[in-house]
Structure formats: structure tokens, C-alpha cells
Amino acid sequence: MAQMTMVQAINDALKTELKNDQDVLIFGEDVGVNGGVFRVTEGLQKEFGEDRVFDTPLAESGIGGLAMGLAVEGFRPVMEVQFLGFVFEVFDAIAGQIARTRFRSGGTKTAPVTIRSPFGGGVHTPELHADNLEGILAQSPGLKVVIPSGPYDAKGLLISSIRSNDPVVYLEHMKLYRSFREEVPEEEYTIDIGKANVKKEGNDISIITYGAMVQESMKAAEELEKDGYSVEVIDLRTVQPIDVDTIVASVEKTGRAVVVQEAQRQAGVGAAVVAELSERAILSLEAPIGRVAAADTIYPFTQAENVWLPNKNDIIEKAKETLEF
């Protein structure tokens, strides 16, 4: 075991798969010589060579096309979209080509592509760098969408993503890159894609969330417990597919739920969770499902995000409203 940041855990996972499988290739803007904008791929080109870890031109559509071609020829590409706000430049390659490969070929071809991309608020980025676009990707058939909330999950989920025979979008919240460390096994391990994690057990209310909002939800749970409430916190880990069985079981136990996301409220992952709970756990609910999300505006940049992003106080307020209904 070693104490790792999320950056270190992701780097370790990439290194593990480069060693294990000669067909794994890593590429994107600045991922080679510089080791990526956040140094996530630092040292990998030096260790594994320019043929396996390499830089591309600043052209997201070209990166996606390259990944598609390599995948159908038997490689396992790990492509990076430098910031998730630029995913629209490569959206056709991802959702229109890579995601459809198995269906389009009648199962004779697969596209084992891992699409890595930093996203998320709290670091005061310029416009288009922090956008939370996981809902759009999750709605694209053929894609799995994974969002780790810490170093341990980051390594295990990335190894699982690279080994998947179907495409996985692996989103890395920038605020979590170096904000804390966790014990991470130095040996390889996997975490099942599509399986949520009960971060904290409780009996009075279920807080269902993912990504950076897991940390905010855990802080909120601590404060709520000081007032005598028993709070369960569930980290989805994967937003496509959603682990419906786990969240339904939790709500059947607690009778109340608050769904938390950093992204805008409209048509997001949170809305999908609420719909599933409404269909499958409605008779267990003792109060309307609470929702915490950002406002339905464009993502603000730099310091403006301080008043836009959801935080633990928003979660506490909504949880108390739900508990006292």
C-alpha cells in the first residue's frame, strides 16, 4: 500500500496497463513530452517510448478518429481530451462512431477505447475547461461513463476501463487531483464498472452523489449526524450504467433521498437517478426526493464559480428539508 494522490493513482494505473498489454497506447495533446497539463502521464513516454505514449496535434476530432482506427485494428487506445469542455470537437467520433462500433458491426468488431478527460469546478479555470458534461455522454448509447471520487477508485476503475472491450469515458475531476491522499495498493486491482459504493451507512436518509460532490456530501453527513440524523452516502462511481439496485435498496431502508450533482440541474445524471427511484422505490418514500445541483446557466469561469457550485451547506439545507417533511 502507498499513500497516493489521484494524479499518482491514475499514473500508476496507466503504467500498469502499459506493462501488461503491448496493445495499450496513450495519446493526446501534451501527454507525451510534458506528461499532460496536470502531469498525469508524467514519465510514461520516457519509460515506454514514443511509439506507445505520444503527443498529437491540437485537433480533438483527429484524436478521436485515430482512436477509432486503432481500436478496430486491435489496439487499446487511451485518448485524452485535454478538457471536457472541448469534447464537442470530437463528439461525433466518440458518440457517432466509437460508441456504435459493436452495434454497427453486428458484434463482429469492438472499440476498446478509453476516453480520459479532466473536468469540474473549484479550481477557477477559464471558460470551457470545467464544464460538467457527463449527462450528455451518459445519454449516448454504447458508452460507459466512470467518475472516480478519490485515488483508490481512480486506479481500480481506470484499469477496468482500459480492459473493457467497449468504450469507456473516464472523467477526472480537477479539484480532486491533488486535494487529498488515500491508501492505494501498489499491485494491480480492478473495480467493477457499474457498481456503486456505499461510502457511509445510515438509516434516516440516503445522499446519492458522485465525483467531487462525494466529499461535500460526506462533510454534510458529519454535520447532520451532530443533529442526531443517521445519514447514508452512496458514491455512484459510474453514471452510465447507474447501479439502480444499490440506490433502490438504500432508499427502501431510509425512506428519504437527496440526489447531489455538481452539474446543472436540467436533464442530468441526478434527474436519471430521481426517475429510477420514482419508478422503483416510490412506495418506500416518506418525502419528496430532494435535489442539489448547479443553476441552469452556462458554467461560470474563474472566481464566479464560487457562488455557483453546490456545497455542503446546500446539501445540509436540502437534507433537513427532506428529513422534516
Swiss-Prot record:
This is Pyruvate dehydrogenase E1 component subunit beta. Heterodimer of an alpha and a beta chain. It comes from the Bacteria. Its cofactor is thiamine diphosphate. Keywords: Oxidoreductase, Pyruvate, Thiamine pyrophosphate. It catalyses: N(6)-[(R)-lipoyl]-L-lysyl-[protein] + pyruvate + H(+) = N(6)-[(R)-S(8)-acetyldihydrolipoyl]-L-lysyl-[protein] + CO2. CDD domains: TPP_PYR_E1-PDHc-beta_like. The keyword Oxidoreductase applies. One of its GO terms (molecular function) is pyruvate dehydrogenase (acetyl-transferring) activity. Its EC number is 1.2.4.1. InterPro entries: THDP-binding, Transketo_C/PFOR_II, Transketolase-like_Pyr-bd, Transketolase_C. The gene is pdhB. It comes from Staphylococcus aureus (strain Mu50 / ATCC 700699). Thiamine diphosphate binds at E60. The pyruvate dehydrogenase complex catalyzes the overall conversion of pyruvate to acetyl-CoA and CO(2). It contains multiple copies of three enzymatic components: pyruvate dehydrogenase (E1), dihydrolipoamide acetyltransferase (E2) and lipoamide dehydrogenase (E3). SMART domains: Transket_pyr. Pfam families: Transket_pyr, Transketolase_C. PANTHER family: PYRUVATE DEHYDROGENASE E1 COMPONENT BETA SUBUNIT, PYRUVATE DEHYDROGENASE E1 COMPONENT SUBUNIT BETA.
